[in-house]
């Protein structure tokens, strides 16, 4: 089941513990799926059930400690961890809290994710009980964990390359998948099937839009509206392999493309090309945002950001936006995602996935066509 060699998880933990030492942390408490998977290799769709809480403690030294429901024991014991503590869950009177208290009894300063994009995946009432029963105190460790996850290993990069290639192959089948008269929900279904046939393990994210000359919404579930000549169809997928995401989209014109749609597509292609040529380590996310924004001119949309981190989550820290001063470093993986508004309430988006390297970034996706493709 383990997706990486043990050394991968050891390095992640070792780097985290080094930063913990610098920050004076005795332990870190994790309770969210992405972080627990990142440090342990525990991957399961059972997280779709909100009933049971799951915990992992990263101590100052040694391997992480799992404190989890009994139902997850066998899978967790296949990971690199040595200590897996379980209880019969759900158990309303004590759903793992006493075990956490015991495990944290010697820790004075305990890190907990409290910052942007963080959630507390345990009952708030149980957290208050835990807080009252331990001698230590909780402090925010969000930035510490983000700093570790920000830079990908070559093993992680290789998996993301593979899932990008899977999606590329599915997108390349567009001329055989989409046609005039096809209900949009069937187009989505057929594309999802293509992704699975090409090798995706899961397709947890597939959104898009379609409409005459363009679309006005890119996050709704597909309706039964049929594709018509002159429609612009966009599909955006976050498919996964070994729990790692790709995240990019492609646009097509159905039958024919209007001048407005072709111009919008051309602007986005050129804007993305500027980013692909100019991005370098040492630039800040804000600088990249401003570069893309400037290239789009007055056509820029108000979505708020022009890309984001990518990895074991569909969207990760950081964001290519104003005020994000995160510095790009080698082996970060980010999306380049310019968008623009045009016509009467229409929009268009364009997305590629890249890895920051010494010099020009490495393009992980197959570059979109230079001109808006027309499906006949």
Where on the chain are the PLM-derived regions?
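Active-site neighborhoods and metal-handling regions in enzymes and metal-associated proteins
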Residues: 1-376
